[in-house]
Amino acid sequence: MARVYVGNLDPRVTAREIEDEFRVFGVLRSVWVARKPPGFAFIDFDDRRDAEDAIRDLDGKNGWRVELSTKAGSGRGRDRSGGSDMKCYECGEPGHFARECRLRIGSGGLGSGRRRSRSRSRSPRYRGRSRSRSPRYRRSPSYGRSPRDRSPKRRSYSRSPPPARARSYSRSPPPPRERSYSRSPAQPANREESPYANNA
């Protein structure tokens, strides 16, 4: 546990306003605001590192002086059940702190709803909007297409080219014509001397 001292407070500030300022840094065990005299407060953090974060961010804000308290009993009664200033700011009854109030049972304690909303490393990359989408989740123009879909189209040869047309020789060429010698050449006529030739 770590206790934080807050000074230079406006006398009209309430414990609820103080809690709202400090609960963003971690779980608060209690918040106590002085009234007699007013002007300061003590906040108990469950984790010392949360208290250091709050001091770094809130010291000087609104003119406040915020520092780590070195005195465990500063500003508070030693008897948890006594003291006129020891009143629960939730119900107004003395004898218990707000974190023990019956009206807050089930809420998980002060600041439990916003546990460690800031990173202890206080790295800039955790501040601001951190929901920017990584480039690897962006849909590229070729999303869902396989590499073969992007390859150049090939001509389809489902129909094979027809074979070269062969000349048909179903009708064989006619053999060369031979001269017909069916008619034998005429025999030279035998000249027979007519018996009457000499008598002529």
UniProtKB/Swiss-Prot annotation:
Entry PTM: Extensively phosphorylated on serine residues in the RS domain.
Zinc finger (CCHC-type): 86-103
Region (Disordered): 105-200
Boundaries of every RRM domain copy: 2-71
A single GO cellular-component term on record: nuclear speck
CDD domains: RRM_SRSF3_like
Function: Involved in pre-mRNA splicing. In protoplast assay, enhances splicing efficiency of WAXY intron 1 and alters the selection of the 5'-splice sites by stimulating site 1 (proximal site).
Family: Belongs to the splicing factor SR family.
Protein name (Swiss-Prot/TrEMBL): Serine/arginine-rich splicing factor RSZ23
